[in-house]
Amino acid sequence: MKQQTEVKKRFKMYKAKKHWVVAPILFIGVLGVVGLATDDVQAAELDTQPGTTTVQPDNPDPQVGSTTPKTAVTEEATVQKDTTSQPTKVEEVASEKNGAEQSSATPNDTTNAQQPTVGAEKSAQEQPVVSPETTNEPLGQPTEVAPAENEANKSTSIPKEFETPDVDKAVDEAKKDPNITVVEKPAEDLGNVSSKDLAAKEKEVDQLQKEQAKKIAQQAAELKAKNEKIAKENAEIAAKNKAEKERYEKEVAEYNKHKNENGYVAKPVNKTLIFDREATKNSKVVSVKAAEYIDAKKLTDKHKDKKLLISMLSVDSSGLTTKDSKKAHFYYNNGAGGTLVVLHKNQPVTITYGNLNASYLGKKIASAEFQYTVKATPDSKGRLNAFLHDDPVATIVYGINIDPRTKKAGAEIEMLVRFFGEDGKEILPTKENPFVFSGASLNSRGENITYEFVKVGNTDTVHEINGSKVARHGNKVYSKTDIDVGTNGISISDWEAVQGKEYIGATVISTPNRIKFTFGNEIVNNPGYDGNSMWFAFNTDLKAKSITPYQEKGRPKQPEKATIEFNRYKANVVPVLVPNKEVTDGQKNINDLNVKRGDSLQYIVTGDTTELAKVDPKTVTKQGIRDTFDAEKVTIDLSKVKVYQADASLNEKDLKAVAAAINSGKAKDVTASYDLHLDQNTVTAMMKTNADDSVVLAMGYKYLLVLPFVVKNVEGDFENTAVQLTNDGETVTNTVINHVPGSNPSKDVKADKNGTVGSVSLHDKDIPLQTKIYYEVKSSERPANYGGITEEWGMNDVLDTTHDRFTGKWHAITNYDLKVGDKTLKAGTDISAYILLENKDNKDLTFTMNQALLAALNEGSNKVGKQAWSVYLEVERIKTGDVENTQTENYNKELVRSNTVVTHTPDDPKPTKAVHNKKGEDINHGKVARGDVLSYEMTWDLKGYDKDFAFDTVDLATGVSFFDDYDETKVTPIKDLLRVKDSKGEDITNQFTISWDDAKGTVTISAKDPQAFILAHGGQELRVTLPTKVKANVSGDVYNLAEQNTFGQRIKTNTVVNHIPKVNPKKDVVIKVGDKQSQNGATIKLGEKFFYEFTSSDIPAEYAGIVEEWSISDKLDVKHDKFSGQWSVFANSTFVLADGTKVNKGDDISKLFTMTFEQGVVKITASQAFLDAMNLKENKNVAHSWKAFIGVERIAAGDVYNTIEESFNNEKIKTNTVVTHTPEKPQTPPEKTVIVPPTPKTPQAPVEPLVVEKASVVPELPQTGEKQNVLLTVAGSLAAMLGLAGLGFKRRKETK
């Protein structure tokens, strides 16, 4: 509805005594929305348009309540279904309800007031009964309170930070300690707290923060005590380290005083590695891994004479080995234990020691691994026998037997030492503090005899001892001079195991890497040894003066640090919000009531902020209302939306109280403090915000959002639920609902059965031209228990005057029982007297209820049940095409379009006719001859008649048929070959009754079941074939046309014509072939020979037929004429044969014919080759005929008559009759009778051979003869006899 201002004008009728007055009701602005109405009621007339012409129907009924005779009677009243009225677009009209309303009348009802129908009685019983005294309008259902627990709610929460004074104080104290880092954790989230439980939660938080403050103070005190203890221990460590440093410095100074003395090295050596007897005294062998062991028992048993370990090892161990390491363990007589193994060249043997107490720079060495690999041995098998000491610092003794005569021998073993800490990780030295170990007891008798050595790597350092004979020579460390037997003044007794002298045969080695070196002995000039052996000990028992390295007695500890964490407390305060929704018509609650299109209603949504007063107002950053409405049902004008601030005590469900608060100003208009937004079907009203994002209005109030809506023309229920928006939460209101009953006008089209409205819908049907039909213009239904006022009700129909002509006839009926004054008009009663027609050019037709009928409709008794009405207007279809028609209903100035009905009027049928020859060629206007078949081919046009044909508009008795009028004087129908076929070529002839009228030359083909026939074959072109045959001896033009009848509509086909030339065969008598002198009527001597001459009929030029047969039959008068056996045929025109052979006029063409003579009848028949030639296209441009000669001998006197019968396409005609006269001979004595034997069979006389370019013509002569096998000579020889050779075929000339 068009809204011009905020004032919506509506009219309501009131009955004052016996008259109806119309009073305007004004709803002014938003205040009017909530209940401000005028008290002044004035009479007013309904507006009428100037210049309107109103007319009464063609059959005004002077008696109110009488029925119209214009509707047909049906068994029951039904509501138009989908098949009769197709709904249009949704925005125009909703689909109609299925099923029938029993109180509704269709145009087929003829119910009058005196004879109510069963349907009307039933309708009255089913409609609710309302007391006539009841004047109250329906009351809306009270709305419910929105449930607090709603799945649609999103928790509305306001952040709340609680105060923690005790925690703050404890934190400040803790921050004074530099060793304490105070970290504030995220505030502990106490979850959601109802605004009603907030006070209790604050007490709970106060207790929590006090307990936390106590814990913080305790943590700070404990850390302080720990750090005071650390400070005391650090002072003690500092004192010890100072004393250690003083010791070290003093020891270094003392060392330096003696560094040039024997037993000292030039530079003080720090003994970083402790791996001596004391450190290994509790060691245990963990494992020995060798490929081969020496069985100790076998060894001692075999070599009992050897007492020394070196001697025992310097033997051949063959046969003494074992794989069992336990059998190899052996205790030497001095009590030293170990494992006997066989070392093989380049095959490592490993022994692992555990339970050590060694150390490196104070770090404990818990285990050690010694790996031995033989690099050189005098044994040819690469063996060395060895004894691996259980004591790691005693290490190894090896030996092998040698031939005493051997001058040179030597052995060399690589040793790899790995140390492991208590954690199992390998301990390695640093460059600053390398491993330092002893290289002692290196015996030597001089480098020219024998010596023991140690080989070192490039990164190893050899620290030579003052006074020692052992020095580094290349990568070997040994003594070059004799220190064993005294040849140089030093014997082994001077230093081996002599306290203070052991340095003579020793050195000190250091390495920054894992310990890896080689040891062994070298015999340069064997003094007579039978074994090669050596004892090597690895340890840190240095044979030189060393300095105990400086070792810290402890490192000062750093004061302990502590991180004290604390947290504050927060919660999400969930305010108890109870938003509310009401729907009103401006004065009262209309929840759950019916409304109709165009009605105004308002939603009042209350946003409850009462509980939000308990939180910090700055934490409320979003506050508003969102209303999502059903945009299909209602529209809104955003400019009229208002928001009011009301006191928290207002009962928003009391609409009177709400109106009073607004009208008095107690509820303030705060619309300016809101941002209003409309997005499609959602209205959002949000409070504006301050610079700090808090809302501008105070909490603790109720905010009323007033939303004005107008109902659309869409039926159905529509609910509305709003949402209060608070920060990130949503709280759903209660739901209100209204109902819009179906109110859709409809349109249909019905047949006009001689002024009576048909019962079947013609929507989407095919309607013939010049057919009269009714448009059914049906109003929407006004609902039962209607509470509104019908101010205006009309229907407009704009005709398509290009296709439809309004005849001026119309009538209207009520579709439900209607009381007018003291009379009750039953459903179906004519109410045309109450309807005004505005007719503009017979095209724009508007039917409107007059004031009397409107007044009656607004009576309370007529509001109990439904109301509706229909108009039927008659039109004539005057042009083919598709025709659409839609009506527009005006109900209280709200315009609604109905569905659109469509009818189709196809073009008139266009049946056609053609005439074909046997080849199927179109020969219309062609020349034909007797015996030709004229096949009349017709199209039966049913394209405009299919399953959508409106059978209700025609008289089925007129049927569907096809009529053909053939020329019975010139053609004969071949009845058995008449066929009707559908568009697919299927024969459907049996579906018709075929009636022949031979006297009139007609045939009628009638569908046995016209309706079923149209349903089955409508929309097609059928093919009708009627073959006929041209009669004999007829000439002139033969015409043919047909007529199609479709339910009384008769349409003729085009006319076809063929031309039949006059038949002209001729008979004559000549003495010789080629004579010009006719002997017809002349005298023929007895015994004289002559010829009967025959000239055939002409095949006309441009002949359209097919030559299928051509012959002549000459029945001789055998009493007078004797067939001589001579015959010939000559061409009367030039033509070509199928193989291209040219035949000229006058050529003898006998070979293209055959002759038979039976029972006195000479028959000459054209061959197929001649017939084919006659049918060639290239021979059609000229007329063709031929001439035949039959030779006879006159054998008796008398008048002799002769007629030849010509057969063309098996149609026979006779020529003219010729006559000759033969007188009797004079009487002479009889001659002696001579018996003549039967004529023997003689070959046919050959015709002069034809010389042709193509030898496709068989050169055999025609056969003659009778059934008695009497052979006659061929007349071909006659040509030579008569000198007619010049009549033979001409040879074609070829151009080479």
Curated annotation (Swiss-Prot):
Major place of residence: secreted
Subcellular location: Secreted, Cell wall
Extent of the signal sequence: 1-43
Pfam assignment, any one: KxYKxGKxW_sig
GO annotations of cellular component type: extracellular region
Pentaglycyl murein peptidoglycan amidated threonine: residues bearing it: 1264
Propeptide boundaries: 1265-1296
InterPro entries reported in the protein's UniProt record: Adh_isopep-form_adh_dom, AgI/II_N, Antigen_C, Glucan-bd_C/Surface_Ag-I/II_V, KxYKxGKxW, LPXTG_anchor, SA_I/II_PAC_V_sf
Chain intervals with Basic and acidic residues compositional bias: 89-99, 160-178
Mode of membrane association: Peptidoglycan-anchor
Biased composition (Polar residues): 100-117, 125-138
Alphabetic keyword roster: Cell wall, Peptidoglycan-anchor, Plasmid, Secreted, Signal
Keyword check for Signal: yes
Motif (LPXTG sorting signal): 1261-1265
Entry superkingdom: Bacteria
Positions of region (Disordered): 48-188, 1221-1245
UniProt keyword Signal present: yes
Family affiliation: Belongs to the antigen I/II family.
Function of the protein: Aggregation substance allows donor and recipient strains to form tight aggregates which allow the non-motile bacteria to maintain physical contact over a period of time sufficient to permit conjugative transfer of the sex pheromone plasmid from donor to recipient strains.
NCBIfam families linked: Agg_substance, isopep_sspB_C2, KxYKxGKxW, LPXTG_anchor
Protein name: Aggregation substance
Native species: Enterococcus faecalis (strain ATCC 700802 / V583)
Gene label: asa1
